C-alpha cells in the first residue's frame, strides 16, 4: 500500500520513486529481521530449555516471570522472562509463538511446581448458573467517545443526505462514498467497545455493538488482568487465565474512573490487576 502511495506521489519523478521504494524495503527488512531475532525456535523438556541453539538447565534457573511486558514494539508486549544463575535472561515474546500457553504451562507446572504432568483446566460454563448470578456491570457510553462521535456522526450524515438530495448525481456519488466510509468506520470502531459484568463466580465480557458475542471466565480460573494503553484515547484490558491463555479487549467506552472501580472490584475477588495506564493518585 505504501509503495502504491509513493508511486502515485512520485509518478513524474522515477528517481524519487525508486529511492522511496528502497527506503521502505530497508525498513521492512529491518523490522522483519528484528522479529526473526526475537523469535527463535524453542525446545523444552524436563531437564532444560534450548533457546537460540543454547541449552540451559532448569536446575540453574533462578527466577521465572511468566507474565509481564517485554518491551517489544508492534506486539502486545507480553512475554515470559527466565533468569538463570549466571544472570543470563531469556525473553519469550507471547505474540511470536502460537503455543505460548503450552510453553508457559510447562514451565509453571512441570519446572516450578514439579508436577508429573500438566493439569488441564475445565473452562465449560453452566449457562443456567450464569443467569442466576448477581453481577456488577461496567458499561460506559460508546457513543460519546472520539471514535463513537466520528462513527455515529457519519451515520447520521448518511441518513440525512437522502432528505436533502437535490443536487442529483453529485449527491448520489457522495451518498455512495458516505455509505462505504460509514460501514468501514463501523467495522473498525465497533471492536473498540466492550462491557464487563463481574459476579462472585464469573467475569463476562460483551461487545457493545455485537451484544450476542461474549466471553465468560470463571473467577477462580483467572490468573491476572492487565490494563494497558492502546492509544491516546483508548485503553485495553487483557484477561490471562491460569493456563496462560489470554485475550485482549479494547475499552474506548470505559473511562479511567470506571476502570479503577472495576480494578477494585476484581482485587476484592483476589484477582491480580496490573495497571499500566491509569494514574491512581
Annotated model-derived regions:
Residues 1-10, 87-89, 95-168, 244, ...:
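N-terminal membrane-targeting/pre-transmembrane regions
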Residues 1-40, 138-195:
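Alpha-helical transmembrane spans
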Residues 17-22, 37-39, 59-66, 117-124, ...:
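Short, mixed-charge, low-aromatic patches
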Residues 26-65, 183-217:
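Conserved beta-hairpin
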Residues 50-104, 122, 205-263, 276-281:
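Non-transmembrane, membrane-adjacent beta-strand/coil modules in membrane-associated proteins
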Residues 70, 141, 169, 275-276:
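Secondary-structure junction/capping motif
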Residues 271-272:
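Extended alpha-helical scaffold/tether regions of large eukaryotic proteins
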Amino acid at each position: 500500500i505504501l509503495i502504491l502511495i509513493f508511486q502515485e506521489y512520485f509518478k513524474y519523478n522515477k528517481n524519487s520513486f525508486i529511492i522511496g521504494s528502497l527506503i521502505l524495503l530497508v525498513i521492512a527488512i529491518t523490522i522483519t529481521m528484528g522479529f526473526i531475532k526475537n523469535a527463535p525456535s524453542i525446545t523444552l523438556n524436563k531437564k532444560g530449555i534450548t533457546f537460540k541453539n543454547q541449552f540451559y538447565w532448569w536446575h540453574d534457573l533462578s527466577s521465572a516471570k511468566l507474565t509481564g511486558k517485554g518491551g517489544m514494539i508492534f506486539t502486545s508486549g507480553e512475554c515470559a522472562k527466565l533468569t538463570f544463575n549466571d544472570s543470563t535472561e531469556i525473553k519469550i515474546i507471547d505474540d511470536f509463538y502460537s503455543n505460548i500457553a503450552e510453553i508457559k504451562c510447562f514451565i509453571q507446572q512441570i519446572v516450578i511446581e514439579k508436577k508429573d504432568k500438566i493439569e488441564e483446566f475445565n473452562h465449560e460454563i453452566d449457562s443456567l448458573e450464569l443467569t442466576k448470578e448477581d453481577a456488577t456491570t461496567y458499561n460506559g457510553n460508546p457513543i460519546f467517545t472520539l471514535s463513537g462521535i466520528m462513527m455515529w456522526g457519519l451515520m447520521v450524515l448518511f441518513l440525512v443526505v437522502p432528505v436533502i438530495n437535490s443536487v442529483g448525481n453529485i449527491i448520489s456519488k457522495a451518498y455512495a462514498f458516505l455509505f462505504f466510509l460509514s460501514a468501514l468506520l463501523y467495522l473498525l470502531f465497533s471492536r473498540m467497545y466492550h462491557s464487563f459484568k463481574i459476579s462472585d463466580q464469573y467475569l463476562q465480557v460483551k461487545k457493545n455493538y455485537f451484544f450476542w458475542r461474549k466471553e465468560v471466565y470463571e473467577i477462580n480460573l483467572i490468573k491476572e488482568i492487565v490494563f494497558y494503553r492502546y492509544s491516546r484515547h483508548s485503553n485495553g484490558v487483557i484477561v490471562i487465565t491460569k493456563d496462560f491463555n489470554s485475550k485482549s479487549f479494547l475499552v474506548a467506552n470505559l473511562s479511567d474512573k470506571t476502570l479503577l472501580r472495576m480494578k477494585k472490584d476484581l482485587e476484592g475477588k483476589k484477582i491480580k490487576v496490573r495497571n499500566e495506564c491509569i494514574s491512581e493518585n
